[in-house]
Each structure stands twice: as C-alpha cells, then as structure tokens.
A protein has these predicted regions:
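ATP-binding/phosphotransfer module of carbohydrate and carboxylate kinases, centering on a glycine-rich
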Residues: 1-66, 76-79, 97-107, 119-129, ...
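Short hydrophobic alpha-helix segments
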Residues: 37-39, 86, 155
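Short loop/edge segments at beta-strand edges and connector loops
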Residues: 109-113
C-alpha cells in the first residue's frame, strides 16, 4: 500500500476485485488519490479478503463515507450480490452487505466492465459520446454499453458478458463450461495460456506481444486473439451501432500493436458500412477503480466525482 497524503474531509474507497489481484484506492472530494494498493486474490476466500481490506481502509481513514466494489461475472447490482463469477469461484455472495458489515459505511457493487465504462464516460475516452462500447481486456473480457447516455445492464444484469460467448463454436474449453469462448482466445490470460500450451513456455502477454513477427507461435496466438475480438465487435456493432469503441484493461497497454490490426480486421468484416472509431481507454488499467470510486461517492451521497480530473 502507498499513501500520498491524508484528508480532512469525506473520502471514498474503490475496490477492484479481479481474478489475479484485488486493487484499491482512496479518493477525496477533489479526486486526489490518497492511498492505493493491491494484493493477490485468494479465490478460495474472496468475500473474507475483501471485507478485511475494507476494514483496514475504514480504520485508516475515519472520513470514509462509501465503498464501491467491482468484480467480473454476473452481478445483481441492485441487491449487491455476485450471482456467479467463474474466475473468482463466487456464487450467490452478498458482497456489498459483507463489506458494509466490515466497514460500517454504505457499500455498492457493480460489474467491473460497467464500472470501467462509467469512468470512461464521465472522466475519460467516452466523454462527448452518447453511445459507446467499452471493452476491458484482462484476466477476462466483458463490455460496458453506454446507450443514450445510460449504462445498460440488461434484463438479468448480464449485459456485456461477451467473454463467455462462443466465438469459435466447438473450440477450446472454457471454465464456464462452454467451448470456444472469446476469453479463451483473446483475454490476456487466454493469450498467455495458448502460447504456453503450444511451446511449453509461460512468458506472459507482454513478451508475446514483443515476439510478434519473429516468433511464429506468438504471431499466430496474437492474430487469433485479434480475429476473435474483431468477430465479437462486429456482432456488437451490427446490433447496437455505437459511435465509439473503447479498448481498456491490461491488454490495452499493447497500444497500436493491438488497436491497428483490430481496426483493420473490424473494417474488413463490416463490408457494407464504416467501422466505429476504436480508441484506447484514457484511464488505462485504473478505469475500473475510478468507476468503483464514483460508485462509492454515489452510495455516500456525493456528486463530487463530476469535478474529478484523473
């Protein structure tokens, strides 16, 4: 944990629960980050781990008035419940209530993809667009849909769970029980796994990206990921017709090595119309945490986030 400074007024905690790590930050009313940190996710005891983090943050910051929680999977935001999150081994967990009990302050839960979209819409690359699609690509893949300036969660709170949509039917198995899912081929975890499976070397996505063009396996794995993403984005573009596509999450750090071939592939698939603009998320890998902090401010009764400038 790193501490920048203390605060005298109200503060808000944003906690981003991922399949690999849990990241958090404390933000004050003007949007200054006071404290931030991370620790590896203990998938066998996520609820207890998050409650412990919240308790420590509340103890260290008496001005804490709200906690925003975000995680992947099927999330009932109204009830603050993780209905099902395959990568976290959670099913039917009332996470917001657990954190409220641990901290003594209001807590709210949101899907991590929608939280990143919320942050990009208010503070980042989505500003000025009434409709956009935000796709964070990390351990998993999801999308946030901003339609008519409103985030769309769907009839069963599962809008945007594209990571578990079969993109290559009958393909490689996914942890969700299906086969050929987008996450299997195009998530950061999936890219690293497929390379390791083919070569016996676990080198990670950054090394795979650097090896494009010189390592035939890295090139094939990367090109397959780009094609899978383009197929998914083609389906979504033709369904909801957004004006902008924002790529975020850890894989977005690849920059034009990812975005340039993705633009080209998407344009080749949309044969009868122009493709939407594809841009990199301006908040980078911290977009989810900023969304969680906005959620914390809202549950704490504040609209101060409207003035934040990350």
């Amino acid at each position: 944990m790193s501490t920048v400074k203390d605060a005298a007024g109200p503060v808000f905690a944003g906690i981003d629960i991922g399949g690999t790590s849990i990241k958090w930050m404390i933000v004050d009313e003007v949007g200054a980050i006071l404290t931030q940190g991370s620790e590896p996710t203990r998938c066998e005891a996520v609820a207890e781990q998050v409650g412990g983090i919240g308790s420590r943050l509340a103890h260290a910051h008496p001005g804490l008035v709200g906690v925003g929680l975000i995680c992947p999977g099927l999330v009932d935001e109204e009830k603050g419940t993780v209905v099902y999150a395959a990568n976290l081994e959670l099913r039917g967990v009332q996470l917001a209530r657990a954190v409220e009990e641990a901290t003594g302050v209001p807590a709210a839960l949101m899907h991590d993809g929608r939280a990143a979209g919320l942050a990009e819409g208010l503070l980042g690359a989505g500003r000025g667009a009434s409709s956009f699609l935000m796709m964070p690509i990390g351990t998993g893949i999801s999308v946030a849909l901003m339609l008519g300036n409103q985030l769309w969660s769907g009839a069963t709170c599962s809008a945007g769970e594209v990571g578990h949509a079969p993109i290559f039917p009958g393909g490689e198995p996914c942890r969700c029980g299906s086969r050929g899912c987008l996450e299997v081929y195009a998530s950061a975890k999936g890219i690293a796994r497929r390379y390791a499976q083919a070569t016996g070397e676990n080198i990670g996505t950054k090394a795979i990206e650097k090896a494009i063009g010189t390592d035939p396996v890295a090139t094939e794995v990367w090109e397959t990921a780009v094609r899978a993403l383009a197929l998914s984005l083609t389906h979504m573009t033709l369904t909801v017709d957004v004006e902008r596509i924002i790529i975020g999450g850890g894989l977005s750090h690849a920059g034009e090595n990812l975005l340039a071939p993705l633009r080209e592939e998407l344009a080749s698939m949309l044969t009868f119309r122009d493709a939407p603009t594809i841009v990199r998320a301006s908040l980078g890998g911290s977009g989810g945490r900023w969304g969680a902090a906005i959620l914390a401010a809202r549950v704490g009764g504040s609209t101060c986030y409207e003035r934040w400038q990350p």
